Amino acid sequence: MKQNNKKPLPSKTKEISLETDWIDVIETMRETNESPKSQNPSEEATTVNELSCEAKPKLLFTPTKSSLSIGNFPYKEFDPVLKFPGIHYTYSRERLWGTCVILSTLFWSYYVLSNSELLEFEASEYSLLFILIIALDALLTVSLFGLFHHLMFLTTNYSYTINSTLDISKGFFINVLSTMVQALVTVTIAFTKFVTIDFPIYVFSSLFLYHPLSRSRQLPTKMQLDGSGERKTDSSLVHQNPPN
């Protein structure tokens, strides 16, 4: 039998052994991978800037109800339960509970007024006290219902946006209506002998009507996108105690 004296074909890739000079290998790789530099340095800078922009994730987006969360727990205070047609305003669970508190307050004031034994006094004796109560009630109403609630929705970008003034005006109009109902309840209770229960009922109903304001938590005002394209909140704004 004839022996096969054919030499092996030369491989394009250089075989690397233990005795290979690694400095030569690295220099060879640099020479093969080196691309010709452009003559214009501005074009090279533009190419680098474009590549760096493409590598960064886009951070500009509009937060929605599903993306607004604290950690892994959804922000349940803003989950819509009822939504009125034609009005960009939603009722959460806490606001529904606060509405029940106001209705119970109305029922209690009606019960007090319907009892003739509780109205045996002259209103002129308490006129100064009535004016003071109404003034303090108006101050609390403006601070709680107007300012904090308005700024809360502006910072969270949930239902209202900064550019959408129409939705903000509708929501503020509804707040004014609820404020008028609350003031009517306060004045009704003030014209009875149960003046001392006016402020506890008002504070109680206000805290439940605007439940997120009664908790010391940081509202998520900054949203980010990670490398995978998923939306997440800033780590500094993650709440330690998740809502029940």
Curated annotation (Swiss-Prot):
Keywords: Membrane, Nucleus, Transmembrane, Transmembrane helix. GO terms for cellular component: nuclear envelope; nuclear membrane. The chain crosses the membrane at residues 96-116, 128-148, 171-191, 194-214. Residues 35-49, 235-244 have a biased composition (Polar residues). Residues 30-49, 224-244 are annotated as: Disordered. It is a multi-pass membrane protein. It is found in: Nucleus membrane. This is Uncharacterized membrane protein C70.04c.
